[in-house]
């Protein structure tokens, strides 16, 4: 599915994604530094990705992890620095939230350190009951040299 505005395109076509651009940005982000290209490929295979393009050049990205029934997690959202300030992040979120396959969910979640105001525009807020949420965190699991060999 493609969306067009002012010379930019947002597409859910996985074949258009530039893994090198995505990997380079994520490797320099606060939330995914050190994530391997293979881990990124696998994460995209198992989610609904949204690429943002200026012509054929990828300039942004987001992905949604979902069961397509009740729950969605928005992850890895970015717009390259040279393209920020043009409303692309807001437009990307509009497209994600309104995607026809992502309607009727009881809960959407995401994590951010620095974009709270952007996400508030789309109805996101702090967890109402954070005491109910737990996580299991092993930041180096996928980056072990033999991880994907044992688990594929």
Predicted regions and their residues:
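Short amphipathic alpha-helix that is part of the acyltransferase structural core
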Residues: 1-35, 130, 145-152
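Conserved active-site alpha-helix within GNAT-family acetyltransferase domains
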Residues: 102-138
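Short helix-loop capping/hinge motifs at secondary-structure junctions, enriched
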Residues: 140-143
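Conserved acetyl-CoA pyrophosphate-binding loop and the N-cap/start of the following alpha-helix
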Residues: 83-92
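A conserved beta-strand-loop-helix scaffold within acyl/acetyltransferase catalytic domains
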Residues: 38-55, 60-78
């Amino acid at each position: 599915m493609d969306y067009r505005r002012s010379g930019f395109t947002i597409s859910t076509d996985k074949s258009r994604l530039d893994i090198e651009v995505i990997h380079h940005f994520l490797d320099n982000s606060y939330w995914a530094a050190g994530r391997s290209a293979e881990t990124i490929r696998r994460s995209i295979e198992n989610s609904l990705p949204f690429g943002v393009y200026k012509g054929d050049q990828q300039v942004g990205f987001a992905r949604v992890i979902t069961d397509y029934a009740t729950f969605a997690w928005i992850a890895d959202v970015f717009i390259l620095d040279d393209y920020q300030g043009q409303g692309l992040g807001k437009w990307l979120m509009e497209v994600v939230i309104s995607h026809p396959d992502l309607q009727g969910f009881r809960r959407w979640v995401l994590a951010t350190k620095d974009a709270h105001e952007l996400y508030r525009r789309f109805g996101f807020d702090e967890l109402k009951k954070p005491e109910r949420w737990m996580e299991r965190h092993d930041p180096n699991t996928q980056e072990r040299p033999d991880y994907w060999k044992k688990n594929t």
